[in-house]
Regions:
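Structural alpha/beta surface segment adjacent to cysteine/selenocysteine redox centers
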Residues: 72-86, 97-106
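The canonical Cys-X-X-Cys-His
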Residues: 41-45, 111
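Thiol/disulfide oxidoreductase modules built on the thioredoxin-like
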Residues: 91-135
Length: 142
């Protein structure tokens, strides 16, 4: 039942967080891999556990962990992430990011590469591996 409630909450958040047409595209940190997570996403816990390996594969790029909800469980999960690797956009920015990045995404795990120009340049749907981090970086402008 908890799993269903989590899924319904995620789906409702996506529907309710839509940004009005014509809104400006959100800005992103350059040269970063954004790793979207939530406590109800079992593979996300594994990705966080493997964060040192993902960061090593990212080289000079940053791997930033982005919570998709504000639940206590997700906050507890984020407590295990080094402060320098947490990115918690405010609700309005997160809504704009959902509109900009999450189209066609069935759910988590989900990661997005942001190039040197601050624009999305690659996405991965599924568990992120060090090899996939390297491939995402290779597909982006420095």
């Amino acid at each position: 039942m908890k799993r269903w409630a989590g899924f319904c909450g995620w789906a409702a958040a996506l529907v309710l967080a839509a940004v009005p047409a014509g809104a400006a595209a959100p800005t992103y940190p350059p040269r970063a891999i954004l790793l979207f997570v939530a406590s109800w996403c079992a593979p996300c816990h594994g990705e966080i556990a493997g964060l040192p390996r993902l960061s090593e594969a990212a080289g000079p790029w940053r791997v930033l962990v982005v919570p998709v909800d504000r639940s206590r469980a997700t906050a507890a999960m984020m407590a295990g992430v080094p402060v320098a690797q947490r990115w918690t956009p405010d609700a309005a920015r997160m809504a704009a990011m959902r509109e900009d990045l999450f189209g066609g995404t069935a759910g988590l795990p989900f990661s997005v590469a942001i190039g040197g120009d601050g624009r999305p340049c690659g996405a991965h749907r599924g568990v992120l591996s060090p090899a996939r981090v390297t491939a995402l970086r290779a597909g982006c402008a420095p």
